[in-house]
Amino acid sequence: VLYGMGDKIAKSLVEQGYRVRVYCPYGELLPGMAYLIRRLLENTANSSFIRQDMENRPIEELISPPVIKEEKEISIPSTPSTPSSPSPLSSFPSPPSPLSSFNPAADSDYAMEELRKKSQVAFESVKKELGKTYLPLINGEEVETEEKVDSVNPSNYSQVVGKVGLINVEQAETAMQAAKAAFKTWRKTTAKQRADIIRKVGDLMEQRRAQLSAWIVLEVGKPVRQADAEVSEAIDFCRYYAAEMERLEKGYNYDVAGENNRYIYQPRGIAVVISPWNFPFAIATGMTVAALVTGNCTLLKPAENSAVIAAKIKEVLVDAGIPEGVFQYVPGKGSVVGSYLVNHIDTHVISFTGSQEVGCKIYADAAVLKPGQKHMKRVIAEMGGKNGIIIDESADLDQAVVGVVSSAFGYSGQKCSACSRVIVVETVYDTFIERFVEATKSLNIGEAELPSTQVGPVIDDKSQSRIREYIEKGKAEAEVVLEMSAPAKG
């Protein structure tokens, strides 16, 4: 709610258990007055719940100066005063019970000196561990591999973040058999036990937030604030899915006359999680803990570019007490190990985030019933896609510019939600372009580790070459309004 408007409503919402944010505009007088007028217009619109609640009040009461009451004087009506003036709270659903409530993790506020220092210390600590070897985890044990690959810092190709052991097909089969054996026990574990483990995973991630953010920055080149936000998202996945599992475990009644119909959920079996490099921590965590908390044994095969970060997820899960064989960390070549696991007759669920080409192939492979396979595989695929933003003459151009810049250049445009084109109505085109160009010029380009960096490196040489090809196509087909220099590497 806006400061000074709807104080009673805000207090009532808080008393009922809802999270309420009070915000206050600040700055120069004229923009501030313009903002106030806009809010007044919104509050007096026909659809405004404030208007619906207040329109039957006497005009003298509405325009009277506000009176500050003591806390004890403020009363909250439990029912509407009249049938014609319903309470603004009547349209809200009942708040969730405390056991199932969900409060998102807060991002680090780097305006606080303490958190800035904590981040610096974390980077110093993580850099001392660079170059270590990370081996697959199969049936609770780390196993040696014939092949290892270097994961390098996109901001500095000479800096090896870690050496990752890649499994072969034989080791993938060993992992699959270990998962089959563990599933017999894991499926019978109570929902509360599974949820408690996943909640502990979230708590450990919260404790290690600064270090985990540093690993994300160094391995995939994501700027510090965005890396920190990704850790928050991973923590949210753990806590939300744990609460949801406890809710779903109760099942549902769908009764008709003369029948008692009870629906309950059961684990499907073995889940193969194939995670991307552009959200190496949040998406990998989300897909993995969702499968685990619902009682499925899970094999995590991360993208090669972000396999060290996935190893950190492995460490957290092990420290949280995940049983042997229930979770396994199986880095490997996608075309070999990934394909083998997708086509395995004992795979029940495939959770994939990545390109459309690979996702469609997974769908096609999963649809084929293999000899000895007694179930249909389920595929959850989030595939590549870029979003266009449409701006018409009614848009707030200041907000539009901020939104487009954030979407297009956040994580160097490597998110699947990144804006790759903007469609602007002709009447506001010139004004928008002028502001957009100036806003883009203000972006700081540099190494992801630097606090001032807003646009860091792309993930590898292949990605950079592809971007440069599109730049050349743009020069040939359209008018260039801005071109800025960028480092030769990254």
What are these regions (language model features)?
Residues G321, N343-H344, V349, E357-G490:
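ALDH superfamily catalytic-core signature
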Residues A181-T189, D203-Q207, Q211-A214, L218, ...:
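Conserved helix-loop functional segments at active or binding sites
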Residues V14-V20, T44-N46, H344-I350:
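Glycine-enriched alpha-helix->loop->beta-strand junction motifs that scaffold or abut catalytic
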Residues V1, V20-C24, V379:
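Hydrophobic faces of well-ordered beta-strands that scaffold small-molecule active sites
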Residues C24-E170, A181, K188, K192-D203, ...:
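Terminal low-complexity tails and localization/encapsulation signals of metabolic enzymes
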Residues G140, S158, A179, R194, ...:
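Residue-level signal for inorganic ion chemistry
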Residues V217, M245-Q399, S452:
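Rossmann-like NAD(P) dinucleotide-binding subdomain of oxidoreductase/dehydrogenase enzymes
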Residues V1-E15, E426-T427, F432:
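Long hydrophobic segments that form regular secondary structure
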